[in-house]
A protein has these predicted regions:
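Phosphate-backbone binding interfaces of nucleic-acid-interacting proteins
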Residues: 1-215, 350, 369, 373, ...
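Conserved mixed alpha/beta core segments that line enzyme active sites in large multi-domain catalysts
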Residues: 48-78, 159, 264, 270-339
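Terminal amphipathic helices with adjacent charged low-complexity linkers/tails
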Residues: 199-225, 402-430, 437
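A carboxyl-terminal module marker
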Residues: 449-452, 469, 599-603, 608-609, ...
Length: 806
């Protein structure tokens, strides 16, 4: 927010400080200063001069010799300017003075340009007459300045006056970084109020008088708002007998200091009020409005609309439009239409000052690709109470500047006025929060400076509507801190005893999973929880898949981020595809992230948020590489040897025959497999990719960090090797389940040591060999005892069609 010091002083006349002092103190009170720009930088010894006499240069056709009265003397200046005449009043830099830059409008040197007396083609010159560019400004800010040549004053100045002061350049502009919650500070009145409070000076806002003739505005225009949620307030007034002319110099100078080019009285008034009150306004030519009616409604999807800049734009049903009885005439809060623009021959004007929903304006501006100064203010969320105040101020300026005749009355559609916010005054809690000892009287004095009221009967602070950032005790405490002075708050250490922290069990389990993954060469990542509905098709999920029942985002960033994910694989596959596209040959990634499973749609209660650990890899790896990593994780969580792998076809995104569900005690904790070839194509990947997804809410209760010590075995073990022949479709997991079930407590371990398929085995069969280890803790086992157990195992294996290999 740019704030010219001279404009601030118009509302705080007793403000007596340098621009830097102003900036520093405002920063300490919470308005962070970005920069200070001095408009008179490098402008030294520049006065008003009157050209008394002009003669031709004897040796140069394009030069003239001027005798210039600079107040206390008349000096001779040689110039090539084509636009000066005798009697003109011009800015003159005297010998030894300095200007900001050259007349070519290029970048000004840091230290300006020093002017010395000298000779031009043999004739002495004791100074220089200045163009507006040499004074560090431009024709955009001073439209009356000539395109080429010397600036000529058209106001009441006299020789010897300070030319910099006369041009309004004896000023400084302080730029502040205003946070979005302080909407009131995006206006000169708001910043002046802050300055008055900071420096303990009186604040004098503009005194707005009643305007309007004896006519009734309702005879000129009717207003209907169809969507009060998107337009909580709409005000309108009518001005007739418009007289376009340049705005007064004081208004032009203030706008110029803000970086706004003066145009004419009508445009300048709307810009001036927008900067003064922070309320954007718009003007329509009333004669172009059909049926003399304004309708505020949503656009229809696909509507085409041409804005003031001549661009045709496509609307959707979320964009709010300003319409007349037949057509759209403006995009609410963003830009008016070319079909209702104000031209030089305008006779009757409709003024609009409204409050639009900030979120809708921001999203609409993004959708149609158009952002303006007005939309930038609206999207922050304006105070509805400010709309009519700004409207009345604009109409007052219309009358004061003779720009037209204001019709009596105003249209004000405001069905749901803002409710007054009241907060309990809790001084003790404020002091406890801040570490201060401020009295109630001091607190109320601070609040009075920023126009916060106080109801003594209820001990409540009354928050004005323009302070939309004050909602709770902590917000009020911050206001106390700002004016008490952050630098005055003593530095103290917190009281209390230090206690040793302890991680929750769930976090400890996640840390173990991370550590094991990283020890196996995996890198952690994080992807968005927002996804596109198109993900379901990429993952080959059927139309009736429960994963398609996803929560929709009410205000998404775009279609690609419009739902909450119900399956965690898309982010992992996208990351792997990106790495593959960058020719990374061997990649291992893991991610911890939630999936969001709604209990019902539309939502009636919070969804089930389930943390998933997703692992993905490609390159020098296969199914069993990833299976080994998962088993490492389970071993580290005290779950080694408890898991079972069951082939599955329930996951359409996994390769059939190369996918398994992982269960512990009959409960599924994860799934693992190779990505389906069609899914690989959908993500533009080649080769083989393996993934595993662990459901942490199911895994965590089963994990344990308890470890029992067992001494060295006192009794010898007995080993039995079993070489078995079976059909290829029998999985080793089925064999191992039988080993555990029938081996009992005496089966210490089992180990797969050979798998064979070849000429010596019947086609469609395979040979699998296991080593079984038996041991008793309290005795030496007998051969017959072990043989009996092995027989039980073999009997059960025969039921699967498994035979001992001859």
């Amino acid at each position: 927010m740019d704030t010219p010091i001279s404009w601030i002083k118009a509302y705080v006349p007793d403000l007596d400080c340098t621009p830097q002092e102003y900036a520093d103190k405002m920063t300490l009170s919470g308005s962070n200063m970005e920069s200070v720009t001095y408009l008179d930088k490098n402008l030294e010894k520049i006065v008003v001069g009157k050209i008394e006499k002009i003669e031709k240069h004897p040796d140069a056709d394009k030069l003239i010799i001027c005798q210039v009265n600079v107040g206390d003397e008349t000096i001779q200046i040689v110039t090539g300017a084509p636009n000066v005449s005798e009697g003109d009043l011009v800015p003159v830099v005297l010998d030894g003075g300095r200007v900001a830059g050259g007349h070519d409008g290029g970048k000004n040197p840091e230290d300006g340009i020093k002017i010395k007396k000298g000779k031009l083609r043999g004739v002495e010159s004791f100074g220089m007459m200045c163009s507006i560019e040499e004074l560090g400004s431009s024709r955009d800010m001073y439209p009356e300045a000539p395109e080429y040549g010397i600036y000529i004053f058209n106001k009441d100045v006299k020789p010897g006056d300070d030319a910099v002061e006369a041009l309004g350049l004896r000023d400084a502009v302080v730029e502040f970084e205003i946070t979005s919650n302080r909407v009131d500070c995006f206006s000169m009145i708001g910043m002046a109020r802050e300055a008055a409070a900071t420096f303990k000076k009186d604040f004098y806002p503009p005194v707005v008088t009643k305007t309007g003739n004896d006519e009734d505005v309702n005879d000129y225009i009717k207003v209907r708002v169809e969507d009060v949620d998107l337009c909580p307030r709409y005000t309108a007034r009518v001005v007739k007998n418009i007289k376009l002319a340049p705005s007064p110099e004081w208004m032009q100078r203030r706008l110029s200091a803000m970086g706004i080019r003066p145009i004419n009285n009508l445009v300048d008034i709307t810009n001036y009020v927008m900067e003064e009150y922070g309320q954007p306004m718009h003007a329509y030519d009333l004669d172009t409005i059909s049926n003399k009616e304004i309708v505020v409604r949503r656009a229809k999807a696909g509507d085409k609309f041409t804005t003031l800049d001549g661009e045709e734009r496509t609307m959707d049903e979320n964009v709010l439009m300003i319409c007349d009885g037949e057509k759209e005439i403006g995009i609410a809060g963003i830009m008016g239409g070319a079909n209702s623009m104000v031209t030089d021959d305008i006779k009757t004007l409709l003024f609009e000052a409204a409050c639009f929903d900030g979120t809708n304006i921001r999203l609409s501006s993004k959708r149609i690709g158009l952002r303006t100064d007005a939309s930038g203010k609206f999207e922050k969320g304006l105070d509805p109470e400010n709309a009519m105040a700004a409207m009345d101020r604009a109409c007052q300026l219309i009358e004061e500047l003779g720009a037209g005749e204001v019709v009596g009355g105003a249209v004000d559609v405001y069905p749901n006025p803002v409710k007054q916010i009241r907060l309990p005054l809790e001084v003790d809690k404020m002091n406890a929060l801040l570490g201060t000892n401020v009295s109630k009287e001091e607190v109320l004095e601070y609040f009075a400076r920023i126009e916060l009221g106080y109801d003594e009967a209820t001990n409540e602070v009354i928050v004005p509507s323009f302070r939309q950032d004050l909602h709770r005790m902590a917000d009020l405490a911050e206001e106390v801190a700002r004016f008490y002075g952050y630098d005055n708050i003593p530095v103290t250490l917190p009281n209390g005893e230090s206690t040793a922290g302890k991680k929750p069990f769930k976090i400890r389990v996640e840390d173990v999973c991370r550590n094991v993954a990283e020890q196996n060469g995996f890198s952690g990542g994080m992807t968005y929880s927002f996804e596109s509905p198109k993900v379901f098709d990429k993952l080959l999920l059927p139309e009736d898949a429960k994963e398609r029942q996803a929560i929709e985002i009410s205000n998404p960033l775009g279609e690609d981020f419009s739902i909450m994910r119900t399956v965690s694989l898309n982010g992992m596959l996208t990351s792997l595809a990106t790495n593959l596209a960058h020719r990374n040959k061997n990649v291992r990634l893991y991610e911890f992230g939630n999936i969001y499973i709604p209990k019902a749609l539309p939502l009636t209660e919070l969804p089930d948020e389930r943390m998933q650990m997703t692992l993905g890899m490609y390159g020098e790896c296969d199914f069993f590489t990833l299976k080994g990593v998962v088993e490492d994780i389970l071993d580290s969580l005290g779950l080694g040897g408890t898991s079972e792998y069951t082939p599955t076809t329930k996951h359409p995104f996994l390769h059939p025959g190369r996918a398994a569900d992982i269960t512990i005690d009959g409960e599924k904790i994860a799934y693992i497999g190779q990505i389906h070839p069609e899914v690989m194509d959908n993500y533009n990947m080649k080769g083989e990719v393996y993934v595993a997804v662990i459901d942490m809410p199911t895994l965590v209760p089963k994990a344990t960090f308890d470890r029992k010590y067992e001494g060295v075995a006192k009794f010898p073990a007995m080993k039995r090797d079993l070489s078995m022949v079976m059909k290829k479709d029998i999985f080793v997991g089925q064999l191992e389940k039988i080993f555990k079930d029938k081996g009992g407590k005496l089966l210490e371990s089992y180990e797969l040591f050979d798998v064979y398929e070849g000429d010596q085995i019947e086609k469609g069969y395979k040979s699998v060999a296991y080593s079984l280890t038996f041991r008793a803790k309290d005795r030496t086992l007998e051969d017959a005892e072990v043989s009996k157990i092995v027989e039980k195992i073999l009997d059960e294996l025969k039921k699967l069609g498994v035979e001992l290999r001859a």
